[in-house]
Amino acid sequence: MIKNYIKTAWRNLVINKVTSLISVAGLAVGIGCFILLATYLLNELRYDRFHVNANRIMRVAYNYKSSDDAEAKSVAVTPTAPVPVFKQQLQEIEDGVRISWYNNPVQYQDKLFNEKRFFLADEPFFRIFSFKFLRGNAATALKDPSALVITASTAKKYFGTEDAIGKVLKVNNKLNMMVTGVVEDVPEYSQIKFDIIGSSAGSEHAKTRKWDSANDYSYLLLRPGVNINSVEQKMNNYVAEMFKDDFRQGHKMWFKLEPLTDVHLKSQATYPLTPSGNIRYIYVLGAVAIILLLLACVNFLNLVTAKAIERGHEIGVRKVMGAARSQLFTQFIIESAMITLVSLLAGLFLADVSFKWFSDFSGQQLGFQTWNTSWLIMAMVALFVTVTFLAGTYPSLYLSAFNPIVTLKGKLTNTSGGRALRKSLVIFQFVVSVFFMICTVIAGSQLRYIQHLNIGINRSQVMVIDVGGKSLKDIKSFNNEVTQLPGVLYATASYDSPVDVHGGYSINHADGKNSDYNLSVTALPVEKNFLNTLGLKLVQGINFTDADEKHSTDADENKRYYGFIINEKAAKALGWTAEEAIGKHIGLNGRTGEVRGVVQNFNFASLHQEITPIVMFTEDYFGKVLIKTSGNNIAKTISAVKEKWSAFNPATPFEYHFLDQEFDDMYKAEQRTGSILTAFTLVTIFISCLGLFGLAVFSTRQRVKEVGVRKVLGASVFSIVKLVSGDFLKLVIISVIIASPIAWYAMHRWLLDFAYKISIQIWVFIAAGAVAILIAFITVSVQSLKAALTNPVKSLRSGD
């Protein structure tokens, strides 16, 4: 019996080629897109879950607020004290580890690389995190102060096929460190991404227990069954008691325990170890995946029910011949299952050939290998059953319920209920399409606005070179030579790249303020040409001078006196105008000096946040050189700078990037989501138009005789096209009216995440509506024009 059902179903699919092809095409595209998005979402959601103790590992976020801060700050970095202190104080904590950046040039024989993913970590690192060892012992790998653990790719880079264990690498041209372990390359879905982990046992920094100067990434391993909130409360009670005098004065700090598996998508802390995702974008893309699948199913459902009238005679004959409703239901479900199976296979093929494109698009390495094989099989079976049920159940019930007498008499017509359902489904499809069109345009406009917004910094054509930590004397020597090169306008230096500037500084003394005054600020040690190089505009006062550099680098720390340049936001937070700020004395984390100048507000950080108070001062130690180029013959300029660098510091590889790239990287999550949304907006339009075209085919077939009569009576081609297309265009207009307020609300909420944002313009809704109507008109007109141009005699004959 089943074999007969399958043969009959296949014959019907072949006979009804148009319906079958449109159904398969729509379902295949919908399923393929669903698989692509599901794979992307799986990759995002599995971050850090490969660790054996993932559910017990907590990242410590550091929160602080002074009495004069408008709001609290939350950062992913902590001082050195929390991990060793809380391990000792709280029995609920089984272990803990601190990680700190240690980017330095590393050399083995004639191989020299500037390692960007080099960290120092406490000994328990590999006991807490489950990175798989290929060589060495995880329990003791970081016990020795000079120990290094490297990834398999790093081992191959330095040693080829030789055994890496016991090999000695020279770090920063002075420190010998021995390889004690080799681990598998870190998975892409790990927020701790490293190439080299060194022992921090020999670091003076790691031996300290400071509660200020946050630079470490801290993780705690809780004992099984421990309540996270209880541990967090005990930690914060301890801190409140230790610093009760500071708390009375309004300066507070507290810690938040963030489950490791939540860090990538849910953490709000700034300065993460690696760029974070956003759980809201996961929800959005998850909804897009489901909606695309629903659109494809709706398409199929619409086409089958519309086609039902043409199958009425077949159903009537089979019922008269004794076919039960259950048998007809089974027949139609098998037809749906066959279309779903073909569509699923086609969708898998489309997904497979699209993975490379989608990987480039999304910035992740995606493919069927992302899935566990058994998971993939179960997912595809579930998808097959779900789509068959969604797309096949109603049409099967609908078709098998036809009255055989009515169908055999040829009196089966479109019922009002059937028409209403099909209209509702068309409206649903175009509501989705118009909604995505509006959202895509607004999101794109916001991202373009951010990219071109004047943030007070001239970031264009600024090279950033990682110098690995150099004195002011060395920096000035190099910069003096570089500025003589054609194509170089200015050169300066800073402790960090402007984009990586951390908070954690406080102005704890200022003229005219109480002794307990404390204002949290962002601070940046810079070389005196920093303002000129980045085009920062002085609104009051003077730039740094040679005297400032001399005073701030005095060998006797007690004699150091700093010149400070602050931004307008800092002056306002201090209660001063720009004019009043000049000459005022302030204290910054133990540094004392006076305000030399006030610059126009500028933004180093993401435009999700407001501009913060910023303080700049000269110092004697720098990690980055910034070179402003003219932009003319940039390749030649880079080559010349590289030549100077090689002569100046042959022990450190020349590596550079451009500052505007760093700024763009801050919005990768938004750009990625926007790009994905744009691509799948086009897919929703395609699926909607595919369904609309199929319905137009059936609609014109039902109105063949009417069209013929109208032509005989003198109707023009335009009037017939208008007649056939009009009903569909009304549905699209209704869709625009429904989608517009929903899209406005969604994008209004999204824009609230940005401190600097566009206003939503009415033209976006008008343009999206016009595009949707135009696309629908073109889609339907292809078929209605064909009907209008058909010989009326032929139309009247076919209508008999």
Predicted regions and their residues:
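Membrane-helix entry/capping segments
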Residues: 3-11, 15, 19, 51, ...
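Mid-to-C-terminal secondary-structure elements
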Residues: 122-135, 148-277, 477-669
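Membrane-proximal juxtamembrane linkers immediately C-terminal to transmembrane helices
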Residues: 35, 42-65, 92, 132, ...
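Hydrophobic alpha-helical transmembrane segments of multi-pass inner-membrane transport and secretion
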Residues: 15-41, 277-313, 341, 421-446, ...
